[in-house]
C-alpha cells in the first residue's frame, strides 16, 4: 500500500504575498497542483494534503481532485509536527508513506519511482532523496556512514564545519509507515527553530538510505519570488527545447512562454514575445508573432498571426490575422480569410474567403463566404439589455463605416453604401443605403468668436 503526504501548511513568508505559497503558479499550474500531478503518476492508494495557513483557499484549489484528503495542521510547528497530526488522524499505518513538500513543482514521477524502488529493494525503514549543491545554503545537510544516513542537520543548526558539507536533503522521504508511527510522537522541538523536525526520525530508524540524484533543477524548492522565477525558467526551457527538437523555430526563445498542454506542428516559426497558453494547438507551417497571445485556441495550417490576441477560438487554414487584432471567445475564422489591423471579432463565425481588413467590430455575427467588410464597420449588437445577432450572406460587399443595428439579416450578394446605418433586413442582390443627402452651401463663413 502506498500513501502520500504533501506538506503544504507553511505561510511562505518570504514570498511577500497574501496568496499561500503553494498556490503560486509555474506555467499556469500551482506549485501544489504540480506536486499532486507527479504523485498521481505513482497510482497511490491515498493522498493527504497537510495544510494550515489559509487552508480553505488551498482546499478549494484542489477540490476537484480524487483521492485527496485534507489534514489541518494548527499551529504550524514543523514538518515532524505535521506527520504527528497525520498519524493521529489516520488509524491504519500500513505500507509506505511518501512525504514531500508542496513547493517542489518540478519533481519528476520517474525520480519518485526510483526512490520507491530503492526503498522496496533494500527493505528500508526510510529512504530519502539527496543531491549535491554548489551552494547548499538554506538546506539541511545529510551525513552518511557507509551506505546509510547517520543524521540530517538543518542549516540553522549547523556549525561551521557541518556547513561545508554539500550533500543536502531534498525533502522527499519514503517511510515504512508502521515503523515511523512507532517513533513519531517521541520527536521534540529541541533546536534553534523550536520546531519539530521530521528529519530527526532519520537517526532513530536503523535502515536509512539515500538516493542521490543530479542537481538538475527538479528538486528546487520555492521560498521566494527569485526561486519562483528560476523554476518558471527551467520549466519553460524544457518545454521549448522539446518543441525545437520536434521542428519548431523560436526567433527569441527567452521572450516567449508556452504552456505544457500546447501542441505545435512542424515548421512553425514562433516570433519574439509570443505566448501560447492553455490547450492551444498550432498546425504546421504557421508564423506566430511577434507580440502575440493565444489561449485555448486552434490555429490551422499556414496561418500568420501578428501582434494580436486570440482567446478560445478556431482559426482555420491559410488565414492572416493582424496586426493589432483581437479575436474573442467562441469565434471561428474559416479558411482563406483575412482579419486586418485594429479589428475585434467576438462570438462570431466568418465563412471561407471573408475579409475584415480595417478598424471594425464584429460581434455575435455570421458572415457569409467571400464577403468583404469595409473599414469602420460596426455590428451594434447590444440594446442595453440583450445581445442580438447580425447575419450577412455570402458574396456581400459592406461599405466603409456601415453600422448594423442588430438583430438584422442580410441576404446574399448584398451591398451597403458607405456611411449607412442599417436597421432593416435586406434581400439577396440588393443595395442597402441609409444616409442623408449631401448639401453644399457655397460661400460659407464660419462664425468668428
Swiss-Prot record:
The keyword Magnesium applies. Binds 1 Mg(2+) ion per subunit. UDP-N-acetyl-alpha-D-glucosamine binds at residues 7-10, 21, 73, 78-79, 140, 154, 169, 223, 328, 346, 361, 372. Residues 1-225 are annotated as: Pyrophosphorylase. In the N-terminal section; belongs to the N-acetylglucosamine-1-phosphate uridyltransferase family. In the C-terminal section; belongs to the transferase hexapeptide repeat family. HAMAP family: GlmU (MF_01631). It comes from Prochlorococcus marinus (strain MIT 9301). It is found in: Cytoplasm. GO terms for molecular function: glucosamine-1-phosphate N-acetyltransferase activity; magnesium ion binding; structural constituent of carboxysome shell; UDP-N-acetylglucosamine diphosphorylase activity. The active site is at 358 (proton acceptor). This is Bifunctional protein GlmU. PANTHER family: BIFUNCTIONAL PROTEIN GLMU, NUCLEOTIDYL TRANSFERASE.
